[in-house]
Amino acid sequence: DYKLTLPMQKYSHLPQLEVGILFSPEICFRLNGIFTCRTTGKKYTGAYNIRQTEDGYLLSQADHREPVSLPLTFEPEDDTTSDFDLTDVVIGIQFHWERKENQKFKGKLKIIDEQKHLTAINILSLEDYLLSVISSEMRATSSAEFLKAHAVISRSWLLAQIDKAKTVRGTYSSYRVDQEEYIRWYDREDHAHFDVCADDHCQRYQGISKAYTPAVREALEATRGEVLTYEGTICDARFSKCCGGATERFDNTWEPVVHPYLD
């Protein structure tokens, strides 16, 4: 037996994230405040829906119909007072608690076409993302040290995925085949057009509709930029909420890569 101590380091560059939220043939949303779309050169506010027709994409508001080209990005003129709502966001995908709910988000709204469906993406800062993740993955009323630990772990996992994507994009395979078995693992590499999704597949992110406490924000500020590292590389810090008192090696659960800190 041995104890592996992982050093924490400050990550100086905290990037903007693109989080996939909603996947549907039609997306209904409400812009609360004034938003600008550079693609159309117009300003928008209020409730809209967008869908594909035989002639292309149609953005609708009440009786107004506007043909548009994708992608569309709606950017708030005032980040502090503006937000947007998405209707019928599916959470707990393929779990027994799967359901739809309406959610509210800060930041930019981007809509793209992924061929099988339209996708709504939230663009926001990493720390604002973590504010919701911590409140969604665990209780926002948990002790301060639990919240700090979760902040460091979630930040480390996310930045490790972003760093990994820079080196494996276009060459990564999430399965292994030999003569006797086919092994498939499900990871964030399944997402080609955004960094992470908002569900349990990556990290649970439910926008600002998920209640959080001042303690969550304090935990983020206290650990701002802190990540776990191993031999100079940010740790792929996997976590679970229900381990049953036992853990498993990383290479027995995901891709066949050995991480000594996840044995």
Where are the language model's segments positioned?
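Conserved, single-site charged/polar hotspot
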Residues: 1-263
